[in-house]
Amino acid sequence: MAGRSKKKGTSGAAKNYITRTRAVKKLQISLPDFRRLCIFKGIYPREPRNKKKVSKGSTAQTTFYYTKDIQYLLHEPLLAKFREHKSVAKKIGRALGRGEAGDAARLEKNLMPKVKLDHIIKERYPTFVDALRDLDDALSMLFLFANLPSSDHIPAKTIALCQRLTREFEHYVITSHALRKSFLSIKGIYYQATIQGQDILWLVPYRFVQRTGGDIDFRIMGTFVEFYTTLLGFVNYRLYTSVGLVYPPKFNAKSDEQGGELAAFQLEGKANATNGASNDHDDDVEINPEAQAKADKIAAMADDEDEQEVEMAEADAEDDDEEENTEGIDKFEPTAPDADILPQPQASSAEIASLFAPFTFYLAREVPRASLEFILKAFGCKRVGWDSILGDGAFTTNESDPNITHQIVDRPPLANGASAAGAEDAATPQVQWPHSTKPGRTYVQPQWVWDCINQGKLLRPDLYAPGAELPPHLSPWVKPKKGEYDPNLPLAAQQPDGEAEAFEDLADEDEDAFEVDDDEDMDAVADREGSVEVGEGMDVADSDDDDEDDSESDAEGGADGFAGFDDESEAESDISEGEAARLQHQRELEAEATGKKLDVKAPTKKEQNAAIRKKFDKKKRAEEEERDRQKMMLSNKKRKLLKRIEYGENKRDTESENLRRKRTRLEKAKAAAERA
């Protein structure tokens, strides 16, 4: 018995997906409202595996959604708000058409519905951890809008809201010492904080003048900002209440107008808020003598207990001195050079959180004040000062304050003679910036702060002195793998066997070529002075022939004149080595017969490097041959997989080799400049 035939497009993939046009008709809303609703609800387009089946044979470009998602939107309360908004907009349009501007303003003020997203936040994030996991994009978007200028597309009210929410979040990070890492990149400054076990990473743009292009759809971005501001408001409230702070914190509008930023917010504990009236008159309160006597008695009992605890602690310390101290953090070291790198246990986060606690910083006018203030305070520093021109809220605005221990500057050192142009004696050493350094004060560049927090310790400040060549600023989230180039390690520890000698010979060849070019240029200058008809250092007539010769030589021998390893070249090398050994033995016999001493020439550096390279090239060829023999035992599928793996490894090795070669050139140039 044949089964019942099904109508095409009523089951399977065609039923699981729905086009955007059909979805808009089904919800009976406009396309902008549909986009806005999908952003609020977290519904995004889907890509079916077989578009032809879903679109019933059509190949036109179409946007698809899950049918269940659109069915889920049918019960959304915001649909009624959108329809009500549309109805009020029609009434306002008719009032404006009649010229009744007052009635239109009254209708907009009284009848325009207010869209609230509280229920959507609760639906999308059932737990607080879910909200923290989705906070990365929210913070990046809000920090971006907080630094944008107001325009027709971005109202100043939205920018002020983003600034308030982001600074409230920064205050929580400072109070809880949740900041872990930061990185200066081309896009902006990356921050990573750990809140309730969740790593949150966001991007803050640099404070340059932002120019918004005309190809940006601010309606879509504004919808995201509307949702993210609601989300961050919920998160800030939960975070503040979890540490016993009142939300929202007090806001000083006057300080904010003067550029106070973080200083414009005053945090307040719940106990202080409830007892604020009584705290204002603490001096007028009379002390109860009976209560004071009981408090003194309890304090005396606590002192006796403390003395006993101190004696017991001293006895325990004497016993511990006799034994080996095993309370330190264990370090897991690999047993073999090719073993896996084990994650090491870290020190207490409390020590890192108070990294800058004992110091007083002063920020120069040219450094990024907002980011440095946030980082320094997040890592325990309570005293950060800057020039009064940078804004309100500084610990001190006096650069000569004796309490300052560190000054962060980012000015290039003045060249000799620039600071004293009217000096009579040119041989006298000139004063460089800073003209008057304060004794006992450390001058560093801003990168010192970022590198210290990323490594979790205070680094040497002399490496970051003003005008010094800074160490490489590396991303704290990217760890170099085996075989990759690591700027922190010395070059000799990363180069494979024989590579240093090869680089040295190539550098010598480059220097020789450079000297030849210099000689040709000098000849051209001399010829130019004597005659105009000379080719000015260029071989004009023979250029075509040279190009042909070069192309032929490149085609025959490759870019470096290397034609590969074959049996004939190996045989020639063996014959030459045997002939050289025979001639050397013959000279030794002749010297022994005549009674003369054989003059042994010491090999040159180039010959030594060539011998070392030859040795390791031979070893490398043997390894490649063994690898090829092992490949022959693999199946075709595994051989293709191995080929893809080798392609990635070769690409990584080539990039690492280029970086090592570049570093070798830079180090040689630096050494030559120092010698000069």
UniProtKB/Swiss-Prot annotation:
Residues 298-338, 413-439, 478-502, 515-676 are annotated as: Disordered. It comes from the Eukaryota. GO terms for biological process: maturation of 5.8S rRNA from tricistronic rRNA transcript (SSU-rRNA, 5.8S rRNA, LSU-rRNA); maturation of LSU-rRNA from tricistronic rRNA transcript (SSU-rRNA, 5.8S rRNA, LSU-rRNA). Keywords: Coiled coil, Nucleus, Ribosome biogenesis, rRNA processing. Residues 579-608, 620-631, 643-659, 666-676 have a biased composition (Basic and acidic residues). Residues 415-427 have a biased composition (Low complexity). It is found in: Nucleus, Nucleolus; Nucleus, Nucleoplasm. One of its GO terms (cellular component) is nucleoplasm. Component of the NOP7 complex, which is required for maturation of the 25S and 5.8S ribosomal RNAs and formation of the 60S ribosome. This is Pescadillo homolog. The gene is NOP7.
